[in-house]
């Protein structure tokens, strides 16, 4: 077989071994396996209704939970085709030349959507444009049907003049369409552009013409919602997310607990209390918050002692969230990195190879942690001013969401002790301020290793998180892998039960870390232990 060497084929010609699929396996989060076909999200709405805001925010969320998503903004394509914007006349429905250009831009954008979803491993594409006519939406539906894409429409409806004016002044004044123009001229031209679109605008009709489509109408920035014919899991998650976000001004403060006794010793995990300097930080944090004069501030902590002790010093009510607890290091809890490297050298190497996907034996991975923290993100999106006192890995995951960081960067984000991250949501992202309180603390950050393996050396086999792929371009059936501590429940033969009680037998080759090098990860068919 292709997975065996020539010597193995000669000595064991009767034996077939599964090919090594791990080196070519695409890194993908759990959520990607919940999409059974690519989805095209189509934005609808007049200009200045927050479509781009929703597109970017939704894309950031979907990428964070592990669904590869990309925005295709039609304005970018239009500015490539027409280098200089002159006035609202370009958007008149009776400007035939401009209409041809706009349609051609849409077709080019859809071709890029097709390439992303079919050739670049994308799962969801967001088509950010007005799409206000039925003709344009029918064209998109035909395109999706030809390529077997699901379609979900998101229509933003707003008739509040104050909201529209604020959106124009906050976002459109800085648009590439208006270089070096004053606010009054921008407002006048853009309002006329909106009037051009109103002439041909046909909102989605849930009672007749569009009753069979899947969509959500977001009315007046989330005051009301209308949801129609949600098709699948991903669409339901999109609806749930859009029903939780808001645009009211607020500030989110993220910080770690004060320095703990285990921090001083270099140990990970555990439930130790604050050190002397950690208690000093808690007092400094209280003084900082009093100076900020924040109204209606909510304080959240984990259920571990070090975050609770930090919050206790603030003298304000706080809520404890178990899902804010630090990443579970399993068998490595309360150990230093030097101890882990000495006792479990292969585990130490595995984590350095792929920190986001690596799961501690009996513990969690960063990927697991993102799944665990999703309810926190939903609640943060619903809230006003919040202070979250958490832990290094937890804070990295939360920061990655707000700063739109990918799986490669997430585990290495710097979140030092005794430092506050002040996050202020803005039009298309998040403004970040780093505030260091004047209290010394140990450095718990580990830089990303180089991982420069020699060309003739195969990296240590990666133990992946448990999943069952729903589909694969590879025709060879992959073995189902289970993480340590998560093996399937099934009756054990007396011999197997005895093996488990007495430890590894002579048939089971051992690694330096004590794990079987053949069946690690467990349940591989080629392992003689099975």
From Swiss-Prot:
In the C-terminal section; belongs to the phosphoglycerate mutase family. This is 6-phosphofructo-2-kinase/fructose-2,6-bisphosphatase 2. The modification N-acetylserine is found at residue 2. Keywords: Acetylation, ATP-binding, Hydrolase, Kinase, Multifunctional enzyme, Nucleotide-binding, Phosphoprotein, Transferase. Phosphorylation results in the activation of the kinase activity. It comes from the Eukaryota. The record marks 256, 391 as: Transition state stabilizer.
């Amino acid at each position: 077989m292709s997975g065996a060497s020539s010597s193995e084929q000669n000595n064991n010609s009767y034996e077939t071994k599964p090919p090594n699929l791990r080196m070519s396996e695409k890194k993908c989060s759990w959520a990607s396996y919940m999409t059974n076909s690519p989805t095209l999200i189509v934005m609808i709405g007049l200009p200045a209704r927050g479509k781009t805001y929703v597109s970017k925010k939704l894309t950031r969320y979907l990428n964070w939970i592990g669904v590869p998503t990309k925005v295709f903004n039609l304005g970018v394509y239009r500015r490539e085709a027409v280098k200089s914007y002159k006035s609202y006349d370009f958007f008149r429905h009776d400007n035939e030349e401009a209409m041809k250009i706009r349609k051609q831009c849409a077709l080019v954008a859809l071709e890029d959507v097709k390439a992303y979803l079919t050739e670049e491993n994308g799962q969801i594409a967001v088509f950010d444009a007005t799409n206000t006519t039925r003709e344009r939406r029918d064209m998109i539906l035909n395109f999706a049907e030809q390529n077997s894409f699901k379609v979900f429409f998101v229509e933003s409806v707003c008739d509040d003049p104050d909201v529209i004016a604020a959106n124009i002044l906050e976002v459109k004044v800085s648009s590439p369409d208006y270089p070096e123009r004053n606010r009054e001229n921008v407002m006048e031209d853009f309002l006329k552009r909106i009037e051009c679109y109103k002439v041909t605008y046909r909102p989605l009709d849930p009672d007749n013409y569009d009753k069979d489509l899947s969509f959500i109408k977001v009315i007046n920035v989330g005051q009301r919602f209308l949801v129609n014919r949600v098709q699948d899991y991903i669409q339901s998650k999109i609806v749930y997310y859009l029903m939780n976000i808001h645009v009211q001004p607020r500030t989110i403060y993220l910080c770690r607990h004060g320095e703990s006794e285990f921090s001083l010793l270099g140990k990970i995990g555990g439930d130790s209390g604050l050190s002397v300097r950690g208690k000093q930080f808690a007092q400094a944090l209280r003084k900082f918050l009093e100076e900020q004069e924040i109204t209606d501030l909510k304080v959240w902590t984990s259920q571990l002692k070090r975050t609770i002790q930090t919050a206790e010093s603030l003298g304000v009510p706080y809520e404890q969230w178990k899902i804010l607890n630090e990443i579970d290091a399993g068998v490595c809890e309360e150990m230093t990195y030097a101890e882990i490297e000495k006792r479990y050298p292969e585990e130490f190497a595995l984590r350095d190879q792929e920190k986001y996907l690596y799961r501690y034996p009996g513990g969690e991975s960063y990927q697991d942690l993102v799944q665990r923290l999703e309810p926190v993100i939903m609640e943060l999106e619903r809230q006003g001013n919040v202070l979250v006192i958490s832990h290094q890995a937890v804070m990295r995951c939360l920061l990655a969401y707000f700063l739109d960081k990918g799986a490669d960067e997430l585990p290495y984000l710097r979140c030092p002790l005794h430092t506050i991250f002040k996050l202020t949501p803005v039009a298309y992202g998040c403004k970040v301020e780093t505030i260091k309180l004047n209290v010394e603390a140990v450095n718990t950050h580990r830089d990303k290793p180089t991982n420069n393996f020699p060309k003739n050396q195969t990296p240590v086999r990666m133990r992946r998180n448990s999943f069952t792929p729903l589909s694969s371009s590879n025709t060879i059936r992959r073995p189902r892998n289970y993480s340590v501590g998560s093996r399937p429940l099934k009756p054990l033969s007396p011999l197997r039960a005895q093996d488990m009680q007495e430890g590894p037998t002579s048939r089971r080759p051992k690694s330096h870390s004590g794990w079987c090098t053949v069946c690690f990860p467990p349940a591989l068919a080629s392992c003689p232990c099975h």
